[in-house]
Amino acid sequence: MTLRRLILTLIIVPLVAAGLSSCAHTDNKRLPYAQVNIVFLTQADWITYGVAGAADYEYFVREKREPARYPWTAATYTGFGGVLLCTDYNGRPLAYDMACPVECSRDVTVRINSDMLAECPRCHSLYDVFALSGGPVGGPAAADNYGLTVYHVGAGHMGEWMVVSY
């Protein structure tokens, strides 16, 4: 009887622990897949069109050609709802899909508000893109633990200065 109880304990305890720990996971994969490819060929391009300093940000939306000064090409893609390109407080580049994961609509996109949080205009969810990797800090997204979709930002594999990709 004690061996049976020990075996059950060894099976049940890890399952319960795994179930409880999964509750704290931020779901940042709610949006459908969409191509992302924003290329900055040189450091000068990055400084001119990208984000240059700590807590800086720029919106990239292919359909609206936003920002207008960026050299758009046929190979430029900006995800599901556009790309919010920013830097954290240490100047490290970050990128997120602008579509609110609560609304899941390419037409409902977050914008940086006066408190430096990304805010959804419809559900008023708030996301910290500068310190919490797009994690939710208010509104329905915080209640459901829905974060912004995170994109990769790094040096290109063909010599580009910086590339934003999925």
Task: Identify the function of each model-found stretch.
Residues M1-I11:
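Bacterial N-terminal signal peptides that target proteins for export
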Residues R5-I7, C23-D27:
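Secretory/periplasmic and organellar redox-cofactor proteins
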Residues A17, L94, S114-L117:
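Processing junctions and N-termini across compartments
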Residues A18-S22:
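C-terminal motif of bacterial Sec signal peptides marking the signal peptidase cleavage site
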Residues T26-I112, D128-A131, T149-Y166:
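N-terminal pre-ligand scaffold of iron-sulfur
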Residues Y127-G139:
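Short metal-binding segments enriched for Cys and/or His
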Residues D144-G147:
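Conserved SAM/SAH cofactor-binding pocket of Class I
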Residues M116-S125:
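Cysteine-rich micro-motifs
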